[in-house]
Amino acid sequence: MDITILSAKINTLLSVRNKRSLLFVPIFTAVSPTALAQFDLTGSVNADVIEQNIRSEESGVLSLTTLTVTPSVYASYRSKTIRGLWAGTLTHVDRENDTAGQTQNYAEYTYSAQWTPFERLLDFQASGALTYRNTDSTNYLLSDFITNSDSLAKTRSNTLRANVLVEQNNWVNLQGTASYSDVSSESSVTIGDTALDNDSYQINGSVTNGEYARYLIWELDGAYQNTANNNSSDSDFVTRSANGFADIRMSNSWAIRVTARHEANQIEGRLDSATAKREYNSYGAGITYRQNENRYISVTLNQSDSDESENSSESFVGLDLKWALSSRTQINGNYGRRFYGESASASIEYNSKHFRSSLSYGEEVTNTSRLLANPENLGVFVCPVGSTTISNCFQPDSLSYTPSIDEQFVQLSSLNIEFDDSVILQKRTNLQVGYDFSRVIWAFTWLFSENDYLDQNRLQRTLSLGSSLSYQIGSYTSLNSEINFAKIDGQSDDNSLDGSSDNWNALIGLSRTIGNNLETSLSITYLDKSGDLSNGNSLFGSDYTDRRITLSVTYTYQ
């Protein structure tokens, strides 16, 4: 009997202790920010042997054997409130021809971090990169470490950003962003001593009505950006804009709209007519048909007030459209006038299980540093950071998909940018299409951009088309192909930059995975440039053909 009673007491005591110890688990997890933290470190080494044959009018026939070795390191950190990623590569290039050899090294990195102390309220972000970018717009699609490396310039960019979001309130919702970015580059052979060195400060935000608003729907938006040119004290580029509207509801679906807009662009410290401040204001009234916050169309009659005499006191019709056709399809559009005349913006997005597309058209007054610091991304594929093909990518299942820290939306086309930091009016149309089903991953891109150099009286147009295909032949073997084409046209008052260039970049290759860590591939690449558009400093001139055969081996450490 005594033994039985003692045993029962011991079991009761152990049970109490176990319950107490279990209580400490959630308490420790709550007070320790690293309790759920995860740190991952991976790496890879890639080696390429490239046989290259180049034919050009200026250099004749040139045969090269090139060896590249590229080690890469990827480090990521995740916790409840912090996530970050750093990826770095070092590319060693060793070229040999019949008469001489050449060795070069290119170090690159990219990083991103986000701290969210208050979810859906406040977050801080940091991002940046060190890359080698093409500086010769006539060599668009054709410059890399192997060919036209003299057109590359080491470019650094860093951005710090704070975001505030106050939403789903009864009367007022608020969204705001403050950011600082710096962009700098070294010179290249093709651009001479021209280099970027700019700091940008930007604030933008919006205030809208809350959920309780029934008879008055309103919105106010504003933005200010100052880009300081550290190479020149009289070239600070300042822009500001503000616009707002109010819909006074007359019935369940119809409302009277009043609207106003302000815009100003100026290069401070310069008073010449080409760069004087361009200020434009407009106001108007009209009607709105609204079903809900994602389905409305508004038409207004507006009056303008501008520094430009030809655009002052003009009447014009404005359009504002937002219409969700379904949970998979969204259409946005806006039409009106700005200081340069008629202006429009539009976007269409569609997403299904295996097909995703995005089409956008926009106009902005900007320069090279701003384009590099805030790139447009309409990527329809999500890929691991550092991925070079779409074979490892996938289609997100939602229009609002947010990539994880080690993922990124891949922009399959890029803008053709000149590194002179002139103020330009850029109009661009960008189409991205992706398909992912079974063994096939396919992507198509179409990009048209027009750069109007406001203080140089010259124009550049770029039309580019591209297609990428990855076909899984078997469990370990895939066929990859890419073809890209660009037509570049230049016009200038003195005819010094007039001309046209047709650029081709095509690749087909076969890759095979061996085990969990090793991958081999064999590919053929074809590059071609023809036309009469050249800046005069290109190594191979304006007409040349480059053919390559590449054997590649990649080892990945996980």
Predicted region positions:
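Gram-negative and organellar
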Residues: 36-558
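Cleavable N-terminal export/targeting peptides
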Residues: 1-40, 390-403, 558
